[in-house]
Curated annotation (Swiss-Prot):
<feature type="binding site">
    <location>
        <position position="237"/>
    </location>
    <ligand>
        <name>ATP</name>
    </ligand>
</feature>
<keyword id="KW-0547">Nucleotide-binding</keyword>
<keyword id="KW-0460">Magnesium</keyword>
<feature type="binding site">
    <location>
        <position position="301"/>
    </location>
    <ligand>
        <name>ATP</name>
    </ligand>
</feature>
<feature type="domain" description="GS catalytic">
    <location>
        <begin position="99"/>
        <end position="439"/>
    </location>
</feature>
<dbReference type="GO" id="GO:0005524">
    <property type="term" value="F:ATP binding"/>
</dbReference>
<feature type="binding site">
    <location>
        <position position="177"/>
    </location>
    <ligand>
        <name>Mg(2+) 2</name>
    </ligand>
</feature>
<feature type="binding site">
    <location>
        <position position="184"/>
    </location>
    <ligand>
        <name>Mg(2+) 2</name>
    </ligand>
</feature>
<dbReference type="InterPro" id="IPR008147">
    <property type="entry name" value="Gln_synt_N"/>
</dbReference>
<dbReference type="Pfam" id="PF00120">
    <property type="entry name" value="Gln-synt_C"/>
</dbReference>
<dbReference type="InterPro" id="IPR008146">
    <property type="entry name" value="Gln_synth_cat_dom"/>
</dbReference>
<feature type="binding site">
    <location>
        <position position="320"/>
    </location>
    <ligand>
        <name>L-glutamate</name>
    </ligand>
</feature>
<dbReference type="InterPro" id="IPR004809">
    <property type="entry name" value="Gln_synth_I"/>
</dbReference>
<feature type="binding site">
    <location>
        <position position="306"/>
    </location>
    <ligand>
        <name>ATP</name>
    </ligand>
</feature>
<feature type="binding site">
    <location>
        <position position="172"/>
    </location>
    <ligand>
        <name>ATP</name>
    </ligand>
</feature>
<feature type="binding site">
    <location>
        <position position="124"/>
    </location>
    <ligand>
        <name>Mg(2+) 2</name>
    </ligand>
</feature>
<dbReference type="InterPro" id="IPR014746">
    <property type="entry name" value="Gln_synth/guanido_kin_cat_dom"/>
</dbReference>
Length: 439
């Protein structure tokens, strides 16, 4: 968007603009400026202190600059404010640990190979009543695809969907999920950077609308023990010269198969990025439709990578382990880098399955070469430290990310020891609720 055009878009009611970026956890951060300073924010940028932003700079060298991306300008329909995403700079150069900048660089690498990535997410969330405690209360007892009286939140879902186009999101399917008070609103796929922005916007819209109704919306992977977890399946395709290169004559193309091979090869390390919280691994357990075993198959929802039954230009893969606690910019960069590694090195996919992996014997899984995803954040971080490709995907953010996450894991272990709880507990602790409920 031309800067002058963006300035002309102002509604007379818009007095302030929110400059939005995310921290290492994917949590939105930012500041507001008078609307009259938007052009300055685009051309020169607005300086800020990065030392208090998780995963950014130390206090001894904390000066950063936010430059607005005018193509992301939107006006919030329930408030007299606009929002804009952007990129972060340090010393007049792109800041190496900026999550949005990291994804941009990963996409530039993909484009050098001639590819453009499109991603469609399926973020799930729970709605809870506000009661001032961590005794979470559910406002409805609906189940999967319920549309009658059990689904008390259908009007809230509709309201969220009605606001989405104002932020550039196109809602496609709204429905109650498997868990009581659990919901999903799918929106149309887009280019990877736009989709990452859209995930941040979708969380913002959902939480704001829930707040209007006196409820909390949480994207925490596993807010309730014994209930289904919140996932964020990613539907991914690569395009070249306007054509979907995942499309083969009979099923997927060789490029798509190698892309799958790359993700399977790096799957263990990827979980540290796509499932980056202690709580993530309480969702990744058998029997809740969350993938645990590193495998792939056509139409098979027990596999880590599923190929949906759509061909032609709709050819794509579905990566099923990510959850909404992931920083979408990091997650997309890492997954695409892993897939590109598969294409470059012609990595054939392994562990193909047609049957339910959960019901297989351990011997059968071993025979098919099916391995298991890490069972905890600590295990995932160990795998990340050994994986050059995924580490490189995080760029200059890797050091901050790995240090931050190890401290997170150690803090959790200290909590368990203090509470005399086993290290492998699958119960959801108050430590997790306090840390992840508002992600």
């Amino acid at each position: 968007m031309n800067i002058s055009v963006s300035m002309n878009k102002f509604d007379s009611k818009i007095k302030f603009v929110q400059l939005v970026f995310v921290d290492i956890n994917g949590m939105p951060k930012g500041m507001e400026i008078p609307a009259s300073r938007l052009e300055e924010a685009v051309t020169d940028g607005i300086s800020f202190d990065g030392s208090s932003v998780p995963g950014f700079q130390g206090i001894e060298d904390s000066d950063l600059v936010f430059k607005a991306d005018p193509d992301t300008y939107v006006e919030v329909p329930w408030d007299n404010v606009a929002r804009v995403y952007g990129f972060i700079y340090k010393d007049n150069k792109p800041y190496g640990a900026d999550p949005r900048g990291i994804l941009k660089r990963a996409l530039e690498e993909l484009e050098k190979e001639g590819y453009k990535a499109y991603i469609g997410p399926e973020p799930e969330f729970y709605l809870f009543k506000k009661n001032g405690t961590w005794e979470l209360e559910i406002p409805d007892v609906g189940g999967y695809f319920d549309i009658l009286t059990l689904d008390k939140a259908r009007d809230i879902r509709r309201e969220i969907a009605e606001y989405m186009p104002s932020f550039g999101l196109i809602p496609e399917v709204l429905h109650h999920e498997v868990g009581k008070a659990q919901h999903e609103i799918d929106f149309r796929y887009d280019e990877a950077l736009k989709t990452a922005d859209n995930i941040v916007s979708f969380k913002y819209i959902t939480k704001a609308v829930a707040e209007m109704h006196g409820l909390y919306a949480t994207f925490m992977p596993k807010p309730l023990f014994g209930f289904p977890g919140n996932g964020m399946h990613l539907h991914i395709s690569l395009w070249k010269d306007g054509e979907n290169v995942f499309m083969g004559e009979e099923g997927l193309s060789e490029i798509a198969l190698h892309f799958i091979g790359g993700i399977l090869k790096h799957a263990k390390a990827l979980t540290a990025v796509t499932n980056p919280t202690v709580n993530s691994y309480k969702r990744l357990v058998p029997s809740y439709e969350a993938p645990v075993y590193i495998s792939w198959g056509y139409r098979n929802r027990s596999a880590l990578i599923r190929v949906p039954a759509f061909w032609g230009k709709g050819a794509r893969i579905e990566y099923r382990c990510p959850d909404p606690s992931a920083n979408p910019y990091f997650a997309f960069a890492a997954v695409l880098k892993a897939g590109l590694d598969g294409i470059k090195h012609k990595i054939d996919p392994f562990a193909y399955v047609e049957e339910n992996v959960y019901e297989m014997s351990e011997e059968k899984r071993k025979e098919l070469g099916i391995e298991t995803l890490p069972g905890s954040l600590g295990e995932a971080l160990e795998e990340l430290e050994k994986d050059k490709v995924v580490k490189e995907a995080l760029g200059d953010a890797y050091k901050n990310f790995i240090n931050y996450k190890w401290k997170e894991w150690e803090s959790y272990l200290e909590y368990l020891e203090e509470k005399h709880m086993p290290k492998d507990t699958k119960k959801v602790t108050e430590w997790e609720l306090e840390r992840y409920f508002f992600l």
